[in-house]
């Protein structure tokens, strides 16, 4: 689950009413499609042409609070350049003093997730067609140094002709390697073993694993790794053993096993998949066009000029990046994007101009078991640019670094905040966990392992989602020692372990102070408990122990 910022009022100077609806630029905003970290996604309609778009609204205050201004400014320009038939396009960015509106491609077919839930598994031919489209989009972004890291059927949309469109490319670029699990609010069913175990990973290989899970879902209508008990689910993923129905083609089984290799070094690459016999069958040429742009020594003058105009830089800067083969530099990425866009538009012209849909989904099979529950949300993209969003930071202050985002696992409630925290304290006491009250809505909890005598630690924090709903967020704090040493927190000596009455009393005092309801119920934690901490490495899996604590607590609270 995610921490949701309050929906703030936007400046009236840039926003107008149109027949009772909000108008941004030439777009009239309609219903809300989803809610994400920085704001909402709404459907929009161009007042002149009538074309529908999806408008993602990024809240400026939320962006500043997460210290990602620089990342968003540098990435938006390149995401605007992304032009691939199977990736959701970003058309325009409109700014107001309080919000940023990203005008994106709207598709009417809904999520692939919903389609599978409604219709069940697809036949092999249709599964291959959609998987080829998805992998083409993944390959396109990997070649331009962007990794998705949260691929799943919820992030694959379907257009009116039942073609796949990948959404939310670019989100992961605002996060450091190895940190994405703590920021992801999606289901862990699609996560690679190295992600859920907290090991470092380069990036592309986790997209391969997730693509393999999607392929399995297309073919079988279920997931290869699934369990209601999260620790058991994690064990299944890390073991990499999954059931293969008898109706599956042996050729596709071999591909699935190669893509779902636990060892990332043995896992299939995109090149391996493209060379697989099952994948190559009926493969449209436009999905993987020849790519001479990287090996060519010739410079495209038109592309060079366009990069200079968009980034307000000199030709020498761009040429320096190209000649030094610094492909990760935003200037080089933009140059190659422009080259690729031109080539793909030429080679896929028939695709863009097609007026008749491909063969419809004709499979009559249905889901044999329900899909894992998910939280409905849309994640805000974070593309690269140099000048598009300078107004985000008029003082152009330098940030000290990206604040570490948190992964949210929790439960929702419509009870009063003090009642929620009182029940939490009772549950903790019943489980014989130890806890400390950091503030009325933030607890730090630990459990002693009777076998190893080591402690598993977690934090519980309450947030307000909307006017009636609250989110109790669970977070592992096994990294507290590292944070303290790195200076991200100021350790102070802990007092005695807090009891239930202190939690309830503090909560009542906080309510009496009249805290504003539109923000989270507590401020950021700035100190850590330094009472006897375990500096020595602990055996076993911290992640599994954390989820066991979560499961035990949720079980008590649900009684």
UniProtKB/Swiss-Prot annotation:
Q: Per the UniProt record, which residue ranges are transmembrane?
A: none
Q: Which InterPro entries match?
A: AMPK_C, AMPKA1_C, KA1/Ssp2_C, Kinase-like_dom_sf, PRKAA1/2_AID, PRKAA1_UBA, Prot_kinase_dom, Protein_kinase_ATP_BS
Q: Where are the Phosphothreonine residues found in this chain? A: 32, 183, 269, 355, 368, 382, 488, 490
* Domain (Protein kinase): residue spans on this chain: 27-279
Q: What is its main location?
A: cytoplasm
A single Pfam family it belongs to is Pkinase
- Residue ranges for the region (AIS) are 302-381
Q: Where is this region: Disordered?
A: 484-536
Binding site residues for ATP = 33-41, 56
- Locate the active site: 150
User: Outcome of residue 496 to D?
Assistant: Retains activation ability
Name the coiled-coil region(s): none
Q: Name one GO cellular component term.
A: apical plasma membrane
**Consequence of substituting residue 496 to A:** Hinders activation
EC number(s) for this protein? Answer: 2.7.11.1, 2.7.11.31, 2.7.11.26
Q: What does this protein do?
A: Catalytic subunit of AMP-activated protein kinase (AMPK), an energy sensor protein kinase that plays a key role in regulating cellular energy metabolism. In response to reduction of intracellular ATP levels, AMPK activates energy-producing pathways and inhibits energy-consuming processes: inhibits protein, carbohydrate and lipid biosynthesis, as well as cell growth and proliferation. AMPK acts via direct phosphorylation of metabolic enzymes, and by longer-term effects via phosphorylation of transcription regulators.
Per the record, the domain comment is: The AIS (autoinhibitory sequence) region shows some sequence similarity with the ubiquitin-associated domains and represses kinase activity.
Quaternary arrangement and interactors, per the entry? AMPK is a heterotrimer of an alpha catalytic subunit (PRKAA1 or PRKAA2), a beta (PRKAB1 or PRKAB2) and a gamma non-catalytic subunits (PRKAG1, PRKAG2 or PRKAG3). Interacts with FNIP1 and FNIP2.
| This protein's name | 5'-AMP-activated protein kinase catalytic subunit alpha-1
- Taxonomic lineage: Eukaryota, Metazoa, Chordata, Craniata, Vertebrata
